[in-house]
């Protein structure tokens, strides 16, 4: 076309291209998670009961985080998108706590370095999926509110009472 894209259309295309990149990265991290599971299976390794319980909580959170980001993107719903960042922050806090607990188990001989390496890979990939979900949700909010300052948005969001409330709700739901 001789007329090209309007500014609004260019913003939409840019948002969609960024989201495609985030979805691709999520797929890459999903493959990494699959590789970790395959390694556990092939080497007949098992986490301790407590580590399995922690991974189960993390998996539940990861599913909710992915579903919230995907639903907000599919429906272009900024309200739904606002639920993603508290979930992502919960992911960060949970992975940090699981790492601390793992180090204590390692120090006390309850876990091996090999299992710890796999657990660390799981945690890193889960965190990165959370980051990409956050990017997707922020893009939905930016599109609806016609703003493009995602860092400023995330900074102001974390000072918001609703964010704090949702974060506390999440922390009581995803208990290690």
Named regions from a protein language model:
Residues 1-176:
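Cytosolic, long alpha-helical scaffolding segments
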């Amino acid at each position: 076309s001789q007329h090209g894209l309007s500014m609004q259309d260019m913003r939409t295309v840019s948002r969609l291209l960024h989201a495609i990149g985030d979805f691709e990265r999520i797929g890459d991290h999903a493959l990494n998670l699959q590789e970790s599971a395959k390694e556990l299976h092939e080497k007949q390794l098992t986490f301790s009961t407590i580590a399995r319980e922690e991974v189960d909580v993390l998996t539940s959170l990861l599913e909710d985080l992915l579903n919230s980001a995907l639903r907000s993107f599919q429906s272009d719903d900024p309200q739904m998108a606002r639920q993603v960042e508290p979930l992502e922050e919960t992911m960060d806090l949970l992975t940090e706590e699981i790492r601390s607990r793992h180090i204590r188990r390692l120090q006390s001989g309850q876990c091996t370095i090999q299992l710890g390496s796999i657990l660390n890979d799981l945690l890193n990939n889960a965190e990165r999926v959370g980051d990409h979900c956050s990017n997707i949700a922020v893009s939905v909010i930016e599109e609806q509110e016609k703003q493009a300052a995602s860092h400023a948005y995330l900074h102001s969001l974390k000072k918001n009472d609703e964010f704090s409330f949702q974060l506390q709700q999440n922390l009581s739901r995803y208990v290690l």
